[in-house]
A protein has these predicted regions:
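Early extracytoplasmic/lumenal segment of secretory-pathway proteins
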Residues: 2-81
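A structural signal for short loop-to-beta-strand junctions that line the ligand-binding cleft
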Residues: 63-67, 85-150
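Ligand-binding "clamshell"
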Residues: 78-87, 136-138, 263-275
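Short loop->beta-strand "edge-of-pocket" segments that line small-molecule binding or catalytic clefts
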Residues: 169-188
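Glycine-centered hinge/linker elements that transmit conformational signals in sensory
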Residues: 189, 193-194, 205-238
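Extracytoplasmic/periplasmic substrate-binding proteins
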Residues: 231-294, 333-334, 338
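Mature extracytoplasmic/periplasmic domains
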Residues: 288-368
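Conserved C-terminal helix/tail region of periplasmic/extracytoplasmic solute-binding proteins
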Residues: 357-409
Length: 409
């Protein structure tokens, strides 16, 4: 008897879930995406933009992303536009691990907390949906990566190997004329310039973290005068661009981000990261959730947030000079030598790897500028900030940068 063959249908294709993350190259590294996707069991899509483009898209097109990875000072704009939703800390396993720098405003009672957009002032969602420091169940952004920035300088220009008195005033030192570079971001580079002007005694700000129109006018008057004197080399947009200015010998002193020190090549021998006596310009990144997210995607967003503070990502960030809000978590993923150098500020007992885990970025015997995490965190002068006069500052800054970089207005 002949058997009747039945045609089998093709097996159903199960489509993996996907979480869309919008941010910058500060933390959206391919290694992070790959590891998080493997650990969490769903696809993760990164969209990496520069600071202004990222902020603009986050505010105006929240439907294009699920999680926003940026800095606390951005909340002045993105939260204001209603693009984000409150994050329920009761649904985050990691919340209890977050340290006092963001929850309370400082690492301890001895800390100089700085002025400007101090993260705690924008952390908690208040009953009227505004942001403030009074603790509630809901937050606008989960604190993650942060650092305390300064400037880098060519020691050959500043007394060779003898360490000078490090001050923001060095930016406009006569021997660096024509070789000064600033980061092109009004919420960042503007404050490097302001700290320098105040350290020189040229200007005095009532609150450097929230300058008045008159103070901004004076600051830009100072900057344009320095531009006409030939003080500036250029304004840069990426850390790799900044590193290149040191590698090719163009810059003598400039705004710098920690990862850039790891790619200086031979210039590592003479470029030094400063620990200015006036204090650091600090910044703090974090994760927010777009307003449209709900259901399974909201659950993935919470899982992704918890993953960020579970340890592995914090260890990776440490290898490019950044700290993580759950400071103890990365220790299990770092060697004792790495922890001693990056967090305790001790001498490197061996060559230390970068984010790829192989190439050496810190040589044996080196010591981190500024000391331990606590020592650095206690010396904050100002935070990256979106001031009340941000629109005025941004317009004036854009004109200034265009003139420095030789572009049409």
């Amino acid at each position: 008897m002949a058997l009747k063959l039945r045609k089998l249908s093709a097996p159903a294709t199960v489509r993996r879930r996907k979480l869309r993350v919008l941010g910058t190259d500060i933390s959206l590294l391919e290694a992070v995406r790959n590891r998080a996707s493997t650990d969490l069991g769903f696809d993760i899509e990164f969209e990496v933009l520069d600071f202004p483009s990222c902020q603009r898209k986050a505010a105006l097109s929240p439907e294009t992303y699920d999680v926003y990875d940026q800095c606390f000072h951005n909340l002045s704009i993105v939260w204001y536009w209603g693009a984000l939703q409150p994050v329920d800390t009761d649904l985050l396993k990691c919340w209890d691990k977050v340290g006092p720098l963001t929850k309370l405003g400082g690492v301890d009672k001895y800390a100089n907390r700085g002025v400007g957009d101090v993260p705690v002032n924008k952390l908690y969602v208040q009953p009227d949906h505004s942001l403030g420091p009074e603790a509630t169940r809901y937050i606008a952004m989960l604190p993650t990566v942060h650092n305390f920035d300064s400037f880098g300088y060519d020691t050959r220009i500043f007394n060779g190997e003898a360490k000078p008195r490090e001050s923001w005033s060095m930016l406009f030192a006569p021997q660096a004329k024509g070789r000064l570079a600033l980061v092109d971001e009004p919420a960042i580079g503007l404050f490097d310039a302001a700290l320098a002007a105040e350290a020189m005694g040229v200007l005095k700000f009532e609150n450097i973290g929230n300058m008045t129109p008159a103070e901004l006018s004076s600051l830009f008057g100072f900057l344009h005068a320095k531009r006409q004197e030939g003080a500036f080399l250029r304004c840069w947009s990426t850390g790799h661009e900044a590193a290149g200015l040191f590698r090719n010998g163009e810059a003598a002193i400039q705004s710098m981000w920690s990862p850039a020190y790891n790619v200086l090549g031979p210039a590592t021998e003479y470029v030094r990261e400063s620990a200015p006596e006036e204090g650091y310009r600090a910044w703090h990144g974090g994760l927010s959730i777009a307003r449209h997210v709900f259901g399974a995607t909201l659950g993935m967003a919470h899982e992704y947030m918890d993953w960020w503070l579970s340890g592995w990502a914090g260890a990776l960030m440490a290898r490019q000079g950044y700290y993580i809000a759950a400071a103890a978590a990365p220790r299990a993923y770092m060697s004792s030598a790495e922890w001693a150098y990056w967090y305790d500020g001790q001498e490197a007992l061996e060559d230390l790897p970068g984010v790829d885990g192989h190439s050496t970025v810190i040589r044996k015997g080196a010591r981190r500028s500024g000391g331990s995490y606590l020592e650095r965190a206690r010396r904050i002068a100002v935070w990256n900030t979106v001031m009340d006069e941000h629109n005025y500052a941004t317009r004036a800054w854009t004109r200034f940068v265009a003139q420095v970089n030789g572009k049409a207005r």
